[in-house]
């Protein structure tokens, strides 16, 4: 690349018919060396001096100039040059046209012009369906930002059915599950998350999905299913943030169920797991009994406070427990 760059630099001072191509090829050299500001300057000079605007090089200069700005996160100028490129409408550049529409969509997305971005992604998949999985994924994501959750689900269905080997498949399943959550359709959300966890267990989004399965069951008061889901997260992803969150929520479920001893037994089986000391067990056993009382389950509350006092006769909450027993 250094040699090509030196040669084209010497040619820049030549006759106009040679000079424009020299700018183009120096721009190419700079681009491949990741010198995007210099490449952009050369492409602009080529476009200024180009003797023909119909050739492939002219279109490529417009396209690459868009990328020089895009690589520098200058999305306003990037969008301008990509738009000029797609305006050529060349049938011989369909793949590049579709890619340029994706980049225009990205530029509009970053500038929060979501409806325009959605239209750009849709246009990209129309022009060249072979590159459509990215376009559909982005279009669906934008629909979610627009709170068109049903549209998001339908767009992702197209991606899943038309591009079964897509690199975006795991993300598509996760985003589809999230759309169902937003629609308060927990059953379909859980179904999508289960497919994701089964097909892509090592994916980062699979870990999140596995945890959300437990949370959705928990929110629906389906405690046995939530317990099973959270235990699966802890077993499948030990040491992860998702496992930590699952253990936290699992503790809350067992407290709600007034089964602190059962949680303590489970926690003791986790490799490198919870430090479940006497003081915490004291506190959680009392909290579980108090929650039973607050739910109005008087008989169970009396039994729970009595068990607390038997287990922790000098416990931190023994006075409170005796007080509640007196009220009952």
What are these regions (language model features)?
Residues 14, 19, 46-59, 85-98, ...:
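Short solvent-exposed coil/turn linkers within tandem alpha-helical repeat scaffolds
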């Amino acid at each position: 690349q250094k040699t090509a760059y030196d040669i084209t630099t010497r040619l820049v001072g030549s006759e106009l018919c040679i000079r424009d191509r020299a700018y183009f090829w120096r721009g190419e050299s700079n681009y491949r060396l990741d010198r995007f500001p210099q490449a952009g300057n050369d492409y602009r000079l080529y476009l200024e001096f180009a003797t023909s605007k119909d050739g492939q090089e002219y279109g490529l200069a417009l396209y690459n100039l868009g990328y020089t700005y895009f690589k520098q996160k200058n999305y306003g100028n990037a969008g301008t040059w990509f738009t000029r490129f797609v305006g050529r409408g060349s049938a011989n550049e369909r793949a590049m046209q579709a890619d340029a529409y994706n980049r225009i969509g990205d530029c509009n997305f970053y500038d929060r012009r979501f409806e325009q971005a959605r239209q750009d992604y849709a246009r990209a998949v129309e022009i060249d369906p072979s590159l459509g999985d990215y376009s559909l994924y982005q279009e669906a994501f934008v629909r979610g930002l627009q709170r068109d959750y049903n549209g998001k689900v339908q767009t992702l269905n197209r991606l899943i059915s038309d591009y079964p080997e897509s690199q975006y498949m795991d993300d598509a399943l996760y985003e589809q599950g999230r759309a169902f959550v937003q629609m308060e359709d927990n059953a379909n959300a859980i179904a999508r998350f289960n497919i994701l966890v089964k097909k892509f267990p090592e994916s980062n989004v699979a870990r999140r999905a596995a945890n959300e399965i437990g949370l959705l069951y928990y929110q629906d008061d389906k405690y046995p299913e939530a317990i099973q889901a959270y235990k699966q997260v802890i077993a499948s992803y030990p040491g992860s943030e998702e496992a930590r969150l699952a253990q936290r929520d699992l503790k809350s479920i067992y407290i709600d169920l007034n089964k602190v001893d059962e949680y303590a037994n489970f926690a003791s089986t986790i490799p490198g797991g919870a430090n479940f000391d006497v003081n915490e067990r004291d506190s959680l056993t009392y909290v579980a009994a108090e929650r039973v009382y607050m739910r109005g389950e008087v008989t169970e509350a009396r039994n729970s406070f009595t068990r607390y006092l038997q287990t922790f006769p000098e416990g931190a909450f023994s006075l409170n427990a005796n007080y509640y027993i007196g009220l009952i």
